[in-house]
């Protein structure tokens, strides 16, 4: 298998002293699998797409945040008006006496340690910091180099304060509409999602919520739910031995034939063929020479 493309620090950072850079993806196009000589913070502002991080697929949209380590490999596929910022940084160039290890995950061995959601309030606070960071990182004087690190620290603290796991959105004070619906959808991967009941419990207007969701993500709520269910199915197909019919049920599809049809249409191959791509052939012992 061909090694992923390597992105080098010198192509993104203006000097060997500059610790941070910002690359605006307005929009983010399809990008082949790659790895880096640097770390990244990815913040999604609008649209949607498929982000495959270390072979784990995520259907990403407004408010998603990823902490990418240099050795990670990832790609972007099936993008639709996807707008995001990449905040690039080299840990070895950070000199402030800050608790970076508590601010910039991964904090542990969990597979999803690098994936978080960012509240609407957090997005509003982060955006001007990133804009200033982008301006300062284009300069090479010593004051700008120091200021970029200060701004990165400020951004890291804002993200630490306002990031959350999708399954824990109910613990947030004054949960925003988008945060609440995203959390509810993430918890409905294998169960029926009752939109009317959700709106009634949270005192939301269904029509307004649907309009807000489409405006921020570029797709309907039902389409997004189907997409994250398919992403979950891909994870199970490549990482478990469950039968395809069981995987369909675990991903909210009561009819396995319908699941196969939807999966084939979206992935361009059947669930069985998709699974076969990740099954390694056994290595046969070499025959002794006569």
Swiss-Prot record:
Q: Where is the HTH araC/xylS-type domain?
A: 179-277
Name residues in a coiled coil: none
The answer to keyword Transcription regulation applying to this record is yes
Q: Does the keyword Magnesium apply?
A: no
Molecular function (GO) terms for this protein are:
DNA-binding transcription factor activity; sequence-specific DNA binding
The record lists its disulfide bonds as none
Ranges of the DNA-binding region feature:
196-217, 244-267
Q: Where is this site: Interaction with sigma-70?
A: 246
The UniProt subunit note reads as follows: Binds DNA as a dimer.
- Name under which the protein is recorded: HTH-type transcriptional activator RhaR
Q: Which organism is it from?
A: Yersinia pseudotuberculosis serotype O:1b (strain IP 31758)
The organism's taxonomic lineage, starting at the top? Bacteria, Pseudomonadati, Pseudomonadota, Gammaproteobacteria, Enterobacterales
Encoding gene per record: rhaR
């Amino acid at each position: 298998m061909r090694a992923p493309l390597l992105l080098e620090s010198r192509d993104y950072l203006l000097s060997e002293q500059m610790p941070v850079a910002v690359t605006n993806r307005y929009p983010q196009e399809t990008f082949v699998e790659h790895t880096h000589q640097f770390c990244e913070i990815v913040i999604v502002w609008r649209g949607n797409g498929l982000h495959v991080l270390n072979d784990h697929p995520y259907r990403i949209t407004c408010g998603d945040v990823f902490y990418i380590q240099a050795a990670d490999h990832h790609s972007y596929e099936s993008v639709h008006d996807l707008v995001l910022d990449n905040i690039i940084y080299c840990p070895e160039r950070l000199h402030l006496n800050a608790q970076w290890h508590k601010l910039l995950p991964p904090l542990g061995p969990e597979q999803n340690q690098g994936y978080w959601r960012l509240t609407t309030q957090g997005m509003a606070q982060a955006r001007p910091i990133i804009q200033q960071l982008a301006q300062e990182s284009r300069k090479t004087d010593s004051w700008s180099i120091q200021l970029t690190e200060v701004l990165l620290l400020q951004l890291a603290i804002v993200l630490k304060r306002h990031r959350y796991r999708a399954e824990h959105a109910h613990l947030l004070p004054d949960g925003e509409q988008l945060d609440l619906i995203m959390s509810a959808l993430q918890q409905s991967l294998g169960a029926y999602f009752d939109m009317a009941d959700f709106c009634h419990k949270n005192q939301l207007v269904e029509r307004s919520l649907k309009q807000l969701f489409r405006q921020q993500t570029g797709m309907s709520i039902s389409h997004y739910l189907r997409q994250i269910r398919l992403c979950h199915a891909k994870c199970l197909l490549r990482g478990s031995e469950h039968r395809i019919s069981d995987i369909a049920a675990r991903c909210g599809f009561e009819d396995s034939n319908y699941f196969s049809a939807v999966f084939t249409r979206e992935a361009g191959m059947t669930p069985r063929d998709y699974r076969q791509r990740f099954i390694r052939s056994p290595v046969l012992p070499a025959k002794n020479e006569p």
